[in-house]
Amino acid sequence: MVRRRKGRVIHGVILLDKPTGISSNDALQKVKRLYGAEKAGHTGALDPLATGMLPICLGEATKFSQFLLDSDKRYRVIAKLGERTDTSDSDGQVVQTRPVHVDYDTLLACIAKFRGETDQVPSMFSALKYQGRPLYEYARQGIEVPREARKITVYEIELHRFEGDEVEMEVHCSKGTYIRTIVDDLGEMLGCGAHVTMLRRVGVANYPYERMVTLEQLNALVEQAHRDEKAVADVLDPLLLPMDTAVEALPEVNVIPELMTLIQHGQAVQVSGAPSDGMVRITGGEQKLFLGVGEIDDNGKVAPKRLVVYGE
């Protein structure tokens, strides 16, 4: 018996500008429903408080979402000095209030200490799991559980504004970096406490900021399509970026048509000019059809790891 599909087959990446106040999964489900997509997944959750770039992979692009999850991120953040909360952001309860006696030079010096590789202990209010449950579930019950410090890298952290008790910064960091934790640590370093009042992700990997679209824009396009008696796909699909943009940081290996079939059947092949090791992005023929991702094996061959299945 042929399984009935629960959506249409559509492949690509849409850069959603997530609004504040909803979870990343809620945003994902709204986009999936608007596109009528059979399969969809996001590439790293944003806090409900946070806004900004949330790449959503549709169809076969979901196979490559991990590469975006592992990529560098950029954030704009506004912190309020003088108040520490139990969640390190304005969604939490204020647990400590202290006077703010911070000058510009001291603030700059403290911010500079976050640059480079450091060990960061994740917040209890995070989606990381302990014994199968998200940490925030324990935190809401007042239970603190052990968390291992993780290596993170802050490539750049810049002070954009310091007015009264507000500090605005931009942070370029590695995957797994908790901006709330940076702000909480900064507040303790300054001796006054701090928490996040605004957090916006402005970059994931090399995706262009200007290609982001909001849920309001998507809904408006769908409504206009209905009024004009057009197919929703005709107005929404042009917003999708090609699925190989999720892995564009990987070196490309182009295989001749004769080798494409072997690759698509999971066989490792020898390709002249391929790197000596590491992961690669595999394309085929003169058209450079994206075939998937492979890895250079011990014999120097390109071994396919995740392949695109085209068609229905």
From Swiss-Prot:
Signal peptide: none
Record's catalysed reaction(s): uridine(55) in tRNA = pseudouridine(55) in tRNA
Coiled-coil features, chain-numbered ranges: none
Active site annotation, chain numbering: D47
Catalytic class of the enzyme: isomerase
GO BP term, pick one: mRNA pseudouridine synthesis
SUPFAM superfamilies linked to this entry: Pseudouridine synthase (SSF55120), PUA domain-like (SSF88697)
A Pfam family reported for this protein in Swiss-Prot or TrEMBL: TruB_N
Enzyme Commission number(s) of this protein: 5.4.99.25
Key word Cytoplasm present: no
Keyword Isomerase listed: yes
Recorded GO MF terms: RNA binding; tRNA pseudouridine(55) synthase activity
Keyword vocabulary terms for this entry: Isomerase, tRNA processing
Task performed by this protein: Responsible for synthesis of pseudouridine from uracil-55 in the psi GC loop of transfer RNAs.
Recorded family membership: Belongs to the pseudouridine synthase TruB family. Type 1 subfamily.
PANTHER family associated with the record: PSEUDOURIDYLATE SYNTHASE TRUB1, TRNA-PSEUDOURIDINE SYNTHASE
Entry protein name: tRNA pseudouridine synthase B
Organism: Vibrio cholerae serotype O1 (strain ATCC 39541 / Classical Ogawa 395 / O395)
